């Protein structure tokens, strides 16, 4: 354990069990208060990772974890900057913890740019960012719909030569990663997935290969729709289409099949989509999804 600037404490990963649990408890409290999942899945998985590139910053008050920030290199180049997340326990807000963590993040980043997620678009996060000279760089929408009527969705036909089948762990891993990279070549997070990233998800208790649907052509995979079911909640986890087949309705055809696959197992289905991806937003709205919350990524100002 080493002291970090501005009164934060830096911890190497993987986090000790008690700190790991405290971060998850903090995130759960923030999620309840803000109406949004306050720590992304990637960030949660990094709590257990021993990757030296992950920086964990914590703030305590009266022996209780009051705030947490996570920082990782962005992109593939060492000089590209950093990205991460910052959250403060709702019972310890307006006491300087957010500002102290943000100052520690800036100190560790030096002159390199940083982007931090705030989940839920809260007034407190917006005010903190404004005081520090950070600006809104990206919005991620959470859209949702009830499960009512999912099983009644009309199933679109597939183009000739395409067939839908479930994912086969081990056999399909490499082909899936290649298609995912092509489908999300311009996406700042999803397109960087490696085999290790995929296999970390395949090892999660919620993973069900029957809910990872593949559209296969004679020359290889053409698209996929990955649904997640956990604790009665459904999620469109990832929907990807080979760019060469974009615009032909393949994404919608697979998504309808995915939604029908979780009908009867969930009360609600959520999904996340970039706010500026208007084409995808229209697709989801046409299938009954509506905007429920917004996550904001803030970019650091000049230092």
From Swiss-Prot:
Function noted in UniProt: Catalyzes the transfer of acetyl from acetyl-CoA to desacetylmycothiol (Cys-GlcN-Ins) to form mycothiol.
GO biological process assignments: mycothiol biosynthetic process
UniProt protein name: Mycothiol acetyltransferase
InterPro entries listed in its UniProt record: Acyl_CoA_acyltransferase (IPR016181), Bact_Acetyltransf (IPR050832), GNAT_dom (IPR000182), Mycothiol_AcTrfase (IPR017813)
Binding-site residues for acetyl-CoA 2, renumbered to this chain: 239-241, 246-252, 277-282
Gene designation per UniProt: mshD
Organism of provenance: Kineococcus radiotolerans (strain ATCC BAA-149 / DSM 14245 / SRS30216)
Gene3D superfamilies: 3.40.630.30
Keywords on record: Acyltransferase, Repeat, Transferase
Keyword Acyltransferase: yes
Enzyme class: transferase
Lineage, broadest ranks: Bacteria, Bacillati, Actinomycetota, Actinomycetes, Kineosporiales
GO molecular function: mycothiol synthase activity
């Amino acid at each position: 354990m080493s002291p970090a600037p501005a009164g934060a404490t830096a911890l190497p990963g993987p986090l000790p069990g008690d700190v790991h649990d405290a971060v998850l408890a903090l995130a759960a409290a923030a999620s309840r208060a803000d109406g949004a999942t306050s720590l992304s899945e990637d960030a949660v998985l990094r709590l257990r990772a021993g990757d030296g590139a992950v920086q964990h910053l914590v703030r305590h008050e009266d022996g209780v974890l009051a705030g947490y920030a996570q920082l990782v290199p962005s992109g593939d180049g060492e000089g590209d900057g950093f990205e991460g997340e910052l959250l403060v326990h709702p019972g310890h807000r307006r006491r300087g913890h957010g500002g102290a963590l943000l100052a520690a993040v800036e100190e560790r980043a030096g002159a390199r740019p940083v982007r931090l997620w705030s989940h839920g678009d809260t007034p407190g996060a917006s005010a903190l960012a404004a005081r520090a000279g950070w600006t809104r760089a990206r919005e991620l929408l959470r859209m949702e719909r009830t499960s009512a009527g999912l099983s009644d969705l009309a199933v679109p036909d597939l183009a000739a030569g395409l067939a839908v089948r479930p994912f086969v762990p081990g056999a399909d891993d490499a082909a899936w990663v290649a298609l995912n990279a092509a489908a999300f070549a311009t996406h700042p997070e999803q397109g960087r997935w490696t085999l290790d990233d995929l296999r970390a998800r395949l090892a999660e208790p919620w993973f069900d290969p029957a809910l990872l649907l593949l559209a296969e052509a004679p020359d290889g995979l053409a698209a996929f729709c990955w649904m997640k079911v956990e604790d009665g909640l459904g999620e469109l986890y990832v929907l990807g289409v080979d760019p060469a087949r974009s615009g032909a309705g393949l994404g919608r055809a697979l998504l309808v099949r995915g939604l029908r696959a979780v009908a009867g197992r969930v009360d609600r289905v959520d999904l996340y989509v970039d706010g500026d991806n208007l084409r995808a937003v229209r697709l989801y709205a046409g299938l009954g999804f509506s905007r429920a919350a917004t996550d904001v990524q803030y970019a650091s100002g000049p230092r």
